[in-house]
Amino acid sequence: MAANSAGEYIKHHLGNLTYGKLPEGYVRECHGHAETLSQATWTMACNGTEAKDMGFAAFHVDSLAWSGGLGIIMCLLFWLGARKATAGVPSGFLNFVEIIIEFIDTQVRDSFHGKSKLIAPLSLVIFCWVFLMNLMDLIPVDFIPKTFEWVMVTFFGWSAHEAYFKIVPSTDPNITLGMSFSVMFLIIFLTIKTKGVGGFVGTLALHPFESGNPVVKALLIPINLLLETIALLAKPVSLGLRLFGNMYAGEFVFILLAAMMGTWQFIGAWPWAVFHILVITLQAFIFMVLTIVYLSMAVEEH
């Protein structure tokens, strides 16, 4: 594969199927012809430039669909498992589910020192959901996107270069940061629930610097607020970017192998895929454990 075509191949696989709003007067080249929009229009982006011009209020349809679909599959699997649960010794899939639940329950008991019925189910959902999203990285990079491309070209008249379709939600920072900022809101909620609004404000305004002198204490409040607000925001940012960075790097290696080796990509991809099984499991575990630790810190009494 030539360098230019390899570069285009990689760029195409890193793009998302994007839905957003283009402004009035925007000149777009889509489906083989050019047009000028007479009014602001919500539409699918035909290329990376359009996706960029849609701005922040655009939706990555593929990431949302796959993350939502995998979440539904996860809930369905556990629902079916719960229906078949009996008082006897579990076997097969039920045994697997029981192992996961006991493993996560142990992690929660070891890491969370408060009292909340929310943490264990939340941890189970986070681990299984993130694991399923990461697991999509093991599917050959061209298998589903090429199928989607064929459908859109054959039945909807799209050009092949317009059919962006990513299937690994955790390689999209919008998904990982969305999950991690949800964790931040839970941190705030549990802090207020445990310590009250005054206690929450106190954790931001009265730490880490303290003083018995009222004047000095008042002078330290802006500094404490700045430091603690940064620390609060750093938790979800680092949590989301850690997952995104590791999964994006793994996906990029698969794309590079496919671009360089073509139909022989499976030879090079197999060793990396075997190693990547550890990565996808470890990243789901780390995301879950850090969530438990952050929530435990939120309910600790100082």
Curated annotation (Swiss-Prot):
Keywords on record: ATP synthesis, Cell inner membrane, Cell membrane, CF(0), Hydrogen ion transport, Ion transport, Membrane, Transmembrane, Transmembrane helix, Transport
Keyword Lipid metabolism among record annotations: no
Bilayer topology annotation: Multi-pass membrane protein
Transmembrane segments annotated in the record for this chain: 61-81, 119-139, 148-168, 172-192, 214-234, 252-272, 273-293
InterPro entries given in the database record: ATP_syn_F0_a_bact/chloroplast, ATP_synth_F0_asu, ATP_synth_F0_asu_AS, F0_ATP_A_sf
Biological processes per GO annotation: proton motive force-driven plasma membrane ATP synthesis
Subcellular location: Cell inner membrane
Primary localization: membrane
Keyword Membrane: yes
Entry function: Key component of the proton channel; it plays a direct role in the translocation of protons across the membrane.
Protein name per UniProt: ATP synthase subunit a
Organism expressing this protein natively: Alcanivorax borkumensis (strain ATCC 700651 / DSM 11573 / NCIMB 13689 / SK2)
